[in-house]
Each structure stands twice: as C-alpha cells, then as structure tokens.
C-alpha cells in the first residue's frame, strides 16, 4: 500500500510542481486568469462534486440562488489561490494588494500585548492573514496540519 501511495504522491507532486514552473513563467496576472478557467472546467470532474453540491444544498436549503454559479465562482477562487501560493514571498515583501480593515484595532492589540485569538477560515488565500499579523508585530502561533502528499510539504 505504501508503494502505491508513494508513486501516486510522486506523480501528483511532479504534476503540481510542473504547474508551478509554468505559473512562474507566464506570471501572476495571466496565471490567475488561466488557472481560474482550468479549475472551473476540471474541478467538477473530481469526486468532491457531489459533496460540494450536497453541502451547498444544506447551507442554502430553499433559497432560490444560482448554485451552479456559486460552485463555478468557488472553483475560480481555488484556481486563483493555487496560483497565489507560488507568489506568497512576493506578497510578503509587497502588500499593496492586501487591505486590512480595522487596522486601528490591530495596532491597539500590538500595543497592549495581551493574548488574543484570531479565527479564520479557508477564505481565498487565508495564509496571508498570519503573514500580515506577523509583519504588524503580533507574536503569533499557528496550527498547521501537513499535507498528505509529503512531496509537497517542503513547498
């Protein structure tokens, strides 16, 4: 079983690292557009499709919303987030794309140096929150579960 997982993870990682190189070559702006489109087209082919639809039906129940549009926007967002992982170091140096609301509250927290809990979810590129908090001077600890694919964890 380990050998099957090993080769499965190896092939996945080669595929993903190849995408990463391609993304670096064509740049952030075009990559976000392209991978948004790719994820919209390929995302529904994954086995998670039924789970996504089921969860959306539970969350929205009788609301008369265009659920296909919501799912399409979700896949588009995943494509953009995938691309942005490669550029996290650039974002760390140049934060003109990040808007912090309530910066006065953040400054007060840093000044008061009292314990506080920040809660986030998997919204867009949520890793940027901890990066910006650290840059603002917040003494921060984060919880991280390594990826199942051990070839991708070093990245």
Name these PLM-found stretches.
Residues 2-120, 155:
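Membrane-anchoring hydrophobic helices of lipid-metabolizing enzymes
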């Amino acid at each position: 079983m380990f050998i099957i997982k090993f080769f499965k993870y190896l092939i996945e990682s080669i595929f993903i690292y190849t995408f990463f190189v391609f993304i670096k070559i064509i740049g952030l702006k075009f990559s976000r557009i392209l991978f948004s489109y790719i994820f919209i087209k390929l995302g529904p082919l994954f086995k998670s499709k039924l789970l996504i639809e089921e969860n959306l039906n539970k969350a929205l129940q009788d609301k008369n919303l265009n659920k296909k549009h919501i799912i399409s926007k979700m896949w588009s967002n995943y494509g953009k987030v995938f691309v942005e992982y490669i550029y996290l170091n650039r974002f760390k140096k140049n934060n003109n794309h990040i808007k912090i609301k309530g910066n006065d509250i953040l400054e007060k927290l840093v000044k008061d140096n009292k314990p506080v809990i920040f809660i986030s979810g998997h919204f867009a590129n949520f890793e940027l929150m901890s990066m910006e908090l650290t840059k603002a001077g917040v003494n921060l600890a984060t919880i991280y579960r390594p990826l199942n694919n051990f070839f991708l964890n070093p990245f």
